[in-house]
Curated annotation (Swiss-Prot):
UniProt catalytic activity: a primary alcohol + NAD(+) = an aldehyde + NADH + H(+); a secondary alcohol + NAD(+) = a ketone + NADH + H(+)
Molecular function terms, GO-annotated: alcohol dehydrogenase (NAD+) activity
Residues spanning the membrane: none
Residues binding substrate: 138
Keywords associated with the record: NAD, Oxidoreductase
Descriptive protein name: Alcohol dehydrogenase 2
Subunit structure: Homodimer.
Family: Belongs to the short-chain dehydrogenases/reductases (SDR) family.
Gene: Adh2
Length: 254
């Protein structure tokens, strides 16, 4: 997908990986970048606007844990203004295995609900034009960091959901792919809690191993957007971008 002149909605576009990715997207010249985030950051929005004055950057407060109905209402406001949206990026995520319910609500249910809501506008069975979804998942969806099993499971669920969306594209007209960052230097990983305190030093131990910067991740994220491969499972690790092959162990045959 050529980013230039496109309309993009980015959920959690002001976070660690999210903000650097927003910067890279703005540099590529979309027509509109609509950022939905829980906490407003006027300085960050101003920076994005200054980076490329030709791009219209707007912000709406949004908590992904709200109902599908509330999300649909917000999206209607956006669609009424823009008329069309080309790409939805679902990027909300937390890493704190003390907060079991919220981890699942943000990392998985929020992605499902936001996706479900946008289908009201995109689903070709309802006369919609189709669209593209990029879901930020994680390499922990491939193989868990077992000290944070709740986080890892939530990302595995988001990845499975995305893979199903891609297979449903012939029915809905909506394509999808997953963005799976490796360990990236963000505030998310500098301090976080393991499940039941099974490893109090989990963050420290994790950062003893090679990582990547948010800029490296963001630059590869934009490459994945441009590649626009339905069903792709992108691994963004140590500054590299790789489409991985998913091993099939079972098939429903339906």
């Amino acid at each position: 997908m050529v980013i230039a002149n496109k309309n993009i909605i980015f959920v959690a576009g002001l976070g660690g990986i999210g903000f650097d990715t927003s910067r890279e997207i703005v540099k590529s010249g979309p027509k509109n970048l609509v950022i939905l985030d829980r906490i407003e950051n006027p300085a960050a929005i101003a920076e994005l606007k200054a980076l490329n004055p030709k791009v219209t950057v707007t912000f709406y407060p949004y908590d992904v844990t709200v109902s599908v109905a509330e999300t649909t209402k917000l999206l209607k406001t956006i669609f009424d203004k823009l008329k069309t949206v080309d790409l939805l990026i679902n990027g909300a995520g937390i890493l704190d295995d003390y907060q079991i319910e919220r981890t699942i609500a943000v990392n998985f249910t929020g992605t499902v609900n936001t996706t479900t809501a946008i289908m009201s506008f995109w689903d070709k069975r309802k006369g919609g034009p189709g669209g593209i979804i990029a879901n930020i998942c994680s390499v922990t969806g491939f193989n868990a960091i077992y000290q944070v099993p709740v986080y890892s499971a939530s990302k595995a669920a988001a990845l499975s959901f995305t893979n199903s969306l891609a297979k449903l594209a012939p029915i809905t007209g909506v394509t999808a792919y997953s963005i799976n960052p490796g360990i990236t230097k963000t505030t998310l990983v500098h301090k976080f809690n393991s499940w039941l305190d099974v490893e109090p030093r989990v963050a420290e131990l994790l950062l003893e191993h090679p990582t990547q910067t948010t800029l490296q991740c963001a630059q590869n994220f934009v490459k994945a957007i441009e590649a626009n491969q339905n069903g792709a499972i992108w691994k963004l690790d140590l500054g590299t971008l790789e489409a991985i092959e998913w091993t099939k162990h079972w098939d429903s045959h339906i």
